[in-house]
Design a protein with these regions (language model features):
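Hot-dog-fold acyl-thioester-processing enzymes
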Residues: 2-57, 112-129
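HotDog/MaoC-like acyl-thioester-processing domains
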Residues: 3-7, 11-13, 68-72, 80-129
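Conserved interaction-surface patches within small, structured recognition/assembly domains
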Residues: 56-66, 74-79
């Protein structure tokens, strides 16, 4: 565990990133990380409502360090808040390098907002039936 992290995190996704995920610099493309953040945060949001959820905002994304091919990357989520129709999720992204598999490096953090919707795509209360 990374120093300073809370134990209230939920491991939503863990992946090993591959050469197909790289950018022109040979590190993992930020868009790949963003996509996985969105998936991980959606898993957390769905833990708090029976409705479908859609992404409405990525309020803040901070890339702290690059991710390399072969890194084991974990996406930890934490519920930040629940509004009437919205759910805000914080995501911490941690990489474990091949040369130091027991050391987690915080590589990215983000805050993502979802809205609960019905089958027609209309907003519905998170806790409603």
């Amino acid at each position: 565990m990374i120093l300073g992290m809370n134990d209230d995190r939920f491991l939503a996704i863990r992946v090993m990133l591959l050469p197909k995920d790289t950018n022109a610099h040979g590190t993992i493309f930020g868009g790949v990380i963003l996509s996985q953040i969105d998936l991980a945060a959606a898993v957390e949001a769905r833990r708090h409502t029976r409705h479908r959820v859609v992404t409405v905002a990525m309020r803040e994304v901070v890339f702290h360090a690059p991710v390399h091919v072969g890194d084991i990357v974990s996406f930890y989520t934490r519920l930040a808040s629940i509004g009437r129709t919205s759910i805000t999720v914080e995501v911490d992204v941690e990489a474990r390098r091949a040369d130091q598999p027991d050391v987690g490096v915080k590589v990215t953090e983000a805050t993502v907002v979802y809205v609960a919707v019905d089958d027609a795509g209309n907003k519905v209360p998170v806790k409603g039936s």
